[in-house]
Structure formats: C-alpha cells, structure tokens
C-alpha cells in the first residue's frame, strides 16, 4: 500500500511539472510590475513576454475566452482599435484554456478574421498570474507595470480615450 501511495505521488508530481508553466503573480490593483513570462502563439511558438510587452509602447493586455459573450462583443472593437493604433500601441490578446482548447480558439480566430496578436494560455498560468476572476480581463500596461484596469465592456472609443492619457 505504501508503494502505491509513493508511486501515485511521483506520478502526480511528474504530471504537474510537465504541464505547468513558470508561475508568477502580479498585484494588478496595486499597479504591480509585470514579470517576464513565457507565452505561446496559436502556432505553438513560445515567446518571452518581455519581447512583446516591453518595446517602448503601451500595451492593451486582454485575457479572454472564445465562449464568453462579453469577449465576443469586445473583440470586433479590439480589432478596430488595433487597426487604428497598431503602430502606437501593442495589443495582446491571450485566450484561456478555461473550458476551451487550442483548436476551438484557432477556429474562432479564423472565422472572425482577427489580425491582432493572439496567444493561448495552455496551462492557465497567465490567467492565474494576473489573478483573473472573470472574462474578459483588460488592463493597460506601460513600462512593465499595470497602469490601469479597464472598465468593462471596452469599445473603440473607451480604448482610444484610455490610451490617449
């Protein structure tokens, strides 16, 4: 019996370590510093977040779910904002694995023809790191710090006003 418990513990440890990304935590309300973390695009390419968040531009950072009605409402507005501001503002949309899959997200993005940068939170580490409790989750990041949590729902005009500050 003791051997079975040890084997099960080792198996659980192995599964958890293989499937998890490096964990982090950000004090979003306290406008915390955003640490560097790994993020995957929809093709499975791993990118260091610093390369997309710390390039001298403010960043609209969204954690969303393809099944979320409010996210579906916001995404066309985000696309419009991206088209008008892509040279001045980073737009980073991270779709969660919560009740979803990479395939579902890829299909959703393709069907809606979104062209802004899209990533997939395979392990849920990004949603946990930003302490996301609901979708969509929208923040403005500037100089590696959370500058503002954006009120929901966001639209083109509210995004334009927020990033004009």
Give the location of each predicted region:
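Short active-site neighborhood of thiol/selenol oxidoreductases, capturing the structured segment around
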Residues: 49-72, 92
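Thiol/disulfide oxidoreductase modules built on the thioredoxin-like
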Residues: 110-114, 122-164
């Amino acid at each position: 019996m003791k051997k079975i418990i040890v084997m099960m513990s080792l198996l659980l440890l192995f599964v958890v370590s293989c499937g998890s990304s490096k964990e982090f935590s950000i004090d979003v309300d306290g406008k915390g510093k955003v640490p560097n973390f790994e993020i995957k695009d929809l093709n499975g390419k791993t990118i260091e977040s610093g390369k997309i968040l710390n390039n001298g531009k403010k960043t609209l950072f969204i954690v969303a779910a393809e099944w979320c009605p409010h996210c579906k409402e916001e995404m066309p507005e985000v696309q419009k904002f991206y088209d008008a501001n892509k040279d001045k503002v980073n737009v980073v949309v991270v779709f969660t694995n919560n009740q979803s899959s990479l395939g579902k997200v890829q299909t959703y993005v393709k069907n809606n023809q979104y062209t802004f940068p899209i990533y997939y939170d395979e392990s849920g580490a990004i949603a946990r790191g930003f302490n996301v409790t609901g979708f969509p989750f929208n923040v403005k990041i500037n100089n590696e710090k959370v500058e503002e949590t954006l009120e929901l729902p966001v639209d083109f005009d509210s995004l334009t006003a927020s990033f004009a500050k």
